[in-house]
Design a protein with these regions (language model features):
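Secondary-structure boundary/capping motif
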Residues: 44, 158, 168-172
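Outer-membrane beta-barrel channels and translocator barrels
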Residues: 31, 42-43, 77-79, 164-166
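Alpha-helical support elements that line or immediately flank enzyme active sites
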Residues: 156-163, 176
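Residues embedded in well-ordered regular secondary structure
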Residues: 1-61, 99-102, 143, 160
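Short secondary-structure junctions and interdomain/linker hinges
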Residues: 119, 161-166
């Protein structure tokens, strides 16, 4: 029997599984990020436009994060002593992960650490080995994953009038 644990000849009945290693190697962890910025202007106006994209695959299967961002800023002297500042910032974020505790990715890692190597992962018949009714392999195979999407757009503007009176200016601000 001990030999079967050592050589892995009967992994369903005599498993020797490093559950944490299996879990952390189930995803690629690959990430790529791209950014593009355009800046310009003239004597009275300057602007900056920046867009970004990041796609990050999780170290565990079925976990990922995709994020797109955009930023626009402009500063312009629209008349002598009258300055306009505009800022617009937006993002879209998609996060895929296990659903809820203790089945969240943190819970899965915690149970993978606790799960002894003598409990099978996924067996040849498709069932799973369990300790205390928890199996990281079973959670990862389940459909209980969610996609959280968050989006935000914020904008602000400021109009500054530097009056002819030395040291006196008026500032108006708006934001959403």
């Amino acid at each position: 029997q001990i030999q079967k644990y050592r050589d892995g000849s009967d992994p369903d009945n005599y498993p020797n599984v490093n559950h944490l290693k299996w879990l952390l190697e189930s995803g690629s962890g690959f990430q790529h990020q791209h950014n593009l910025s355009i800046q310009g202007g003239n004597a009275t106006t300057s602007y900056n436009l920046s867009v970004g994209y990041r796609n990050q695959e999780g170290m565990t299967a079925k976990t990922s994060n995709e994020r797109m961002t955009a930023l626009f800023t402009m500063k312009s002297e629209i008349a002598k002593g009258l300055m306009l500042n505009l800022n617009i910032n937006a993002y879209n974020n998609k996060y895929n992960a296990p659903n809820g505790e203790p089945q969240s990715i943190d819970g899965m890692i915690g149970y993978a650490v606790r799960q002894g190597p003598i409990y099978a992962g996924q067996k040849s018949d498709g069932s799973f080995g369990y300790q205390d009714n928890y199996s990281p392999e079973a959670w990862l195979a389940s459909e209980s994953f969610v996609q959280n999407v968050s989006r935000n757009i914020s904008a602000s503007g400021q109009l500054t009038w530097n009056t002819p009176v030395d040291g006196l200016s008026f500032i108006g601000k708006v934001a959403m």
